[in-house]
Amino acid sequence: MKFSQLILPFSAALSLVGSGVATPTTKPVNPRASRPARNLLAHLVRSAGNGTTLSGQQELKDADWVTDNVGFSPVILGVDLMDYSPSRVEFGAVSTSIEDAITYATQGGIITICWHWGELSHDWMTDERLTTLLTLGSPSGTYNTTEQPWWSNFYTEATSFNLSAAMNPASRDYKLILRDIDAIAEQLARLKDIPVLFRPLHEAEGGWFWWGATGAEPCKALYRLLFDRLTKKHGLNNLLWVWNSKDPLWYPGNEYVDVVSVDVYADNGDHSSQLEAYQALQGLTGNFSKLIALGEVGNIPDPELMREDGAQWAYWVTWNGDFIRGETKNPMEFKKAVYASELVYTLDEIQGWNL
């Protein structure tokens, strides 16, 4: 165990005090938020205020790899609801993400969840059917083709699903949206006693996922629908709501967001603090009162550079596979230095935060 009660250098502490930036709120946007959810938000605010960042890793098998090879365990585990999407279940997808989340939470870890939401339509396009419908000028549904196989159905290019049209409550697709939200609610309900950093509709402004393909307004409307249905209809009061874009045009509003975040996949060798992205998120809410996080990273930012620049990310979550295991994005020497840093919290250092 490394020294975990960080005392900020006087100059750094003075910089935080005199920065003019408001302390992030510890009050969740859901007024019925559970006690564990409130405790989690308060813990995140407290640790960020101390100048520390929580380490995080996407997928349990990769978090275990970090433990075995780096020598420390990440605080945060990221899992994906992707294969609980009804359209993917219909095609035979099976997921253990909820079981993985329960396992890690039992060890004292914090859970964050994203959702690569599989396109909602029942209309799967084979190569032959797509060719026929393109001839008629009316393709519809997921392109389950050689070029775009079914498992890519969260990508814009793999589906003709139109969110703008689907947000009409009288449409068939709106009913499918509600069906999917309700199906995901069943899975999230299994975590009802575990606080969750829920990060839906991520990277929307990029347009590469269908939920961002028709612009900001339909996406914001879908996010608000998710919030209302999961909190009010399903009573999922264990969720803290994480927005994932730095573009003001896409922001759904302070009343729907507990944490603002962005995903950053920097060039190889770039372990900078990502100050520009941090400052953009600072200005996003208008009042500087939200926690700021890195929802996904390819390259882990150097904690010393974060401190020097004043980019106080509450947490970061490294993406899975070669992003964490390989030497190109995060060399082993660098990984070990980051996890050993007194500026970075690891799993052993946050035990008991939810008491």
Curated annotation (Swiss-Prot):
Its job: Endo-1,4-mannanase, a crucial enzyme for depolymerization of seed galactomannans and wood galactoglucomannans.
An individual GO BP term: substituted mannan metabolic process
Pfam families: Glyco_hydro_26
Gene Ontology cellular component annotations, sorted alphabetically: extracellular region
Organism of origin: Emericella nidulans (strain FGSC A4 / ATCC 38163 / CBS 112.46 / NRRL 194 / M139) (Aspergillus nidulans)
Enzyme class: hydrolase
Source species, domain of life: Eukaryota
Coiled coil: none
Keyword Plastid part of the UniProt annotation: no
Protein name: Probable mannan endo-1,4-beta-mannosidase E
Annotated ranges, domain GH26: 35-348
Binding site for substrate: W208, Y265
Protein's UniProt keywords contain 4Fe-4S: no
Record's signal peptide: 1-22
Protein family: Belongs to the glycosyl hydrolase 26 family.
Record-listed E.C. numbers: 3.2.1.78
Glycosylation sites: N50, N144, N162, N287
Entry keywords, A to Z: Carbohydrate metabolism, Glycoprotein, Glycosidase, Hydrolase, Secreted, Signal
